[in-house]
Amino acid sequence: MFSEKILLKLYKAWNHRLNMYHILKYKDYEPKIDESAFIAGGSRIVGKVEIGKNASIWFNCVIRGDVGSIRIGDETNIQDGTVIHVDRNPGGDTIIGNMVTVGHFCMLHACTVHDKAFVGMGSTVMDHAVVESEAMVAAGSLVTHGKVIKSGEVWAGRPAKFLKKMSDEEIKYITQSAQNYVMLMREYEN
């Protein structure tokens, strides 16, 4: 009889093969995905992309590192329907730190989101914008070119503007959200 660990390894290898067509090389660049990361069906990951430990990419995301690079940190979750892209001009990479939550149907383009930040559902973060650690972009917001959302701030609106300082409870929620998605991806793997 096969042990449970062997069966899990076989399943992961089989599932990885099923998802291979979702992971595409662009020129000489092939995505580097940590073996502990979770990639849900329907997602497309292209080119110069690096995905960290225990990160999760949920259903129908597009992460396209063709004319620049994308880095997604450890324990970060990119939720369903999100699009992440880059710009070919200097500074056009997209960097997403560790323990970040990016909500459903977001668009991140050539921007930086630091560790333990939160981008709410349906938000857009444009070129050269920065979301600092422990900062929050409210759902449905548009963070325009070059804006910097400082640590401990919530920004909201289209275009996004400073809304308020975050409470300690809201800051804790960011970490909890990242941890919840690590647990959720484990449930999907089992």
Identify the residue ranges that each predicted region occupies.
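Structural signal for interior beta-strand "rungs" in well-ordered beta-sheet cores
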Residues: Y26-K27, K32-K150, V154-W155, A160-F162
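Terminal amphipathic alpha-helical/low-complexity segments used for targeting or macromolecular assembly
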Residues: M1-S36, G146-N190
